[in-house]
Regions:
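Blade-edge beta-strand/turn elements of extracellular beta-propeller
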Residues: 22-32, 76-92, 143-162, 202-218, ...
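Membrane-spanning beta-strands of outer-membrane beta-barrel proteins
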Residues: 97, 133-136, 167, 220, ...
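A compositional/structural signature marking long, glycine- and acidic/polar-rich segments
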Residues: 186-290
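Blade-loop segments of beta-propeller domains
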Residues: 67-108
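Beta-propeller blade signature
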Residues: 69-77, 128-146, 195-204, 250-266, ...
Length: 423
C-alpha cells in the first residue's frame, strides 16, 4: 500500500532522482512523460469545463515495474500541460498492490471513475497469479473537479465474474447506449482464451453480467478494451496477447487494434469483423479514447510495450522510462479507422524551410516536421538520418529505425493506402 502521506514522505528523499531527469538530453519535446520513474497506460481521459485531464499508470520512484499510482496532467490547449500531484494511490485493502488501469465517464457535471484494484495473495499455497491468488476488484468513485474524489467503493469482485474466468479481469471502460451504461472489462479464461466481458447498469453503480465478446483462438488475454461509436459505427479497441505473427501482421510483442461490432442491444447478440491493427509501430499499447467538448474522438496510447526484447536503458540511467503517444483524432471512412494529429499540434510549428534539394541541412533543433510531396507514385528511399529511413517499394511503405546494433528494423508499414507520417 501507499497513501498520499507515504508518497509525500518518500518524495522528499528522491531529489537526486528528479535532478537526474532534468539532466537527460533524451527528454522528449511534445510527448507526455513521467516526471520521474515509469509510465504506462493512459487512464481516465476526459475534458470538463475546458480542461483536459490526462491520467496515467505511474510508478514514481523506480524506472521499472512497481506498485502503480495514477499520475495526472491537465491542459487547456493540448499543447501546454500542468503536472499535477498523483491522483490515485493504492491506499485501501481493495487496491493495496496497485491502482491499475481504468477510465472516466462524465455525466451531469459529475465525473465517474472506474479502475481495477489489484491485490496479490502471495501467502496462499495455490498462488500462481493467473487462476488463483489474486483479486481484481472493480472500484468506483466520483469527483466534481478531477482533483478531489469521493470514497472508493467496490462494485465488482472475483465472485461477480463468470466462473470460467481466470483471475485476469481488468481495465474497465464505460459506454452508454439507449439509457443504459455498459462496462467492458478485458479478460482471460481459465483455458487461456482472451475475451471482453460486458456488464450492464442503469445507475453506474449496480452492474450485472450481460455478455462477452470473443473470437475463437485469438490470443490468451485481451487487455484495455474501449467500446465506442465513431461516425455511426460501433468499435471495440482491444490489445490481444498471444497472437502469432503472419508476415507483416501481428509483428509486435502484443497487438493493438480494433473490431467493428454490429451489436443488437435489444436482443443481446452481435456480429464482429476481422481484427485490424491500429498501429504497426513497436512502441504502442493500451490505447484509450474520449470525446472532447468539440465532439472529437481523441485517443492516447502508451508509447511502450510489455515484455519487449529491447530496453530503454539510456533513459532508465536518468531515472525515467516511457511516454504517451501524441493524441490522435479518430474518424471512420473507407472501411477503416483513420488517425490524424490534433490541429492544435500545428501551433508547435516555428520556421518554415522550403527546399528542392536532394540534401537538406539540418537546422539547430532537436525537433522538426517533414512534409514531402511526390508528383508521381514510384518506388523511393528517403534517408532521414543515418539510422532512420522511409521507403516505398513494391507497394509497401516501410519506416525503418535503427534499434539494435546499427541494423535497420522495420518499424511500421502500410500497403497501398494514403498515409501521413509525422516524424
Amino acid at each position: 500500500m501507499m497513501t498520499k502521506e507515504d508518497y509525500l514522505n518518500e518524495y522528499k528523499t528522491h531529489k537526486s532522482m528528479r535532478d537526474n531527469v532534468k539532466r537527460d538530453n533524451y527528454r522528449l519535446q511534445y510527448h507526455l512523460m513521467p516526471p520521474t520513474g515509469f509510465l504506462n497506460d493512459p487512464n481516465g481521459l476526459f475534458q470538463k469545463d475546458g480542461v483536459y485531464h490526462i491520467y496515467f499508470q505511474y510508478t514514481p520512484f523506480t524506472a521499472g515495474w512497481g506498485t502503480k499510482l495514477w499520475g495526472h496532467y491537465t491542459s487547456k490547449d493540448m499543447i501546454n500541460f500542468n503536472q499535477e500531484e498523483p491522483f490515485l494511490y493504492p491506499d485501501i485493502s481493495l487496491d493495496r498492490d496497485g491502482v491499475y488501469s481504468g477510465s472516466a465517464f462524465v455525466e451531469d457535471e459529475t465525473i465517474h471513475y472506474f479502475y481495477t484494484g489489484n491485490v496479490k495473495l502471495t501467502d496462499r499455497e495455490d498462488y500462481d497469479y493467473i487462476n488463483s491468488g489474486r483479486e481484481q476488484n472493480t472500484i468506483h468513485m466520483t469527483s466534481k473537479d478531477g482533483y478531489k474524489i469521493s470514497e472508493k467503493e467496490l462494485i465488482l469482485s472475483n465472485d461477480d465474474y463468470p466462473i470460467d474466468m481466470s483471475k485476469h479481469v481488468r481495465d474497465p471502460k464505460i459506454f452508454k447506449k439507449n439509457n443504459y451504461y455498459y462496462m467492458v472489462l478485458g479478460g482471460r479464461t481459465s483455458d487461456n482464451q482472451g475475451c471482453v466481458l460486458l456488464y450492464k447498469s442503469k445507475d453506474l453503480i449496480n452492474f450485472e453480467y450481460y455478455n462477452r465478446i470473443e473470437v475463437d483462438d485469438f490470443g490468451y488475454m485481451w487487455e484495455c478494451p474501449d467500446l465506442f461509436e465513431l461516425d455511426g459505427e460501433l468499435f471495440l479497441v482491444v490489445c490481444p496477447q498471444g497472437i502469432s505473427q503472419r508476415g507483416y501482421d501481428y509483428a509486435n510483442v502484443y497487438q493493438t487494434g480494433y473490431f467493428k461490432v454490429d451489436y443488437d442491444f435489444d436482443n443481446n447478440t452481435y456480429k464482429i469483423s476481422e481484427f485490424k491493427e491500429l498501429d504497426r509501430g513497436f512502441d504502442i499499447y493500451a490505447p484509450q479514447s474520449f470525446l472532447d467538448e468539440k465532439n472529437r474522438r481523441i485517443q492516447y496510447a502508451w508509447m511502450g510495450i510489455p515484455d519487449a526484447e529491447y530496453n530503454n536503458q539510456p533513459t532508465v540511467d536518468y531515472c525515467w522510462q516511457h511516454a504517451l503517444t501524441m493524441p490522435r483524432v479518430l474518424s471512420y471512412k473507407n472501411n477503416q479507422i483513420y488517425q490524424q494529429p490534433l490541429d492544435e499540434m500545428k501551433n508547435l510549428r516555428l520556421e518554415k524551410i522550403v527546399s528542392n534539394c536532394k540534401n537538406i541541412k539540418q537546422k539547430d533543433t532537436v525537433v522538426y516536421e517533414m512534409q514531402v510531396d511526390f508528383d508521381k507514385s514510384q518506388d523511393f528511399v528517403l534517408q532521414i538520418r543515418d539510422d532512420v529511413q522511409l521507403s516505398y517499394l513494391n507497394h509497401v511503405l516501410l519506416f525503418f529505425v535503427d534499434i539494435i546494433q546499427k541494423f535497420l528494423l522495420p518499424f511500421l508499414y502500410f500497403q497501398d493506402i494514403l498515409v501521413y507520417l509525422h516524424l
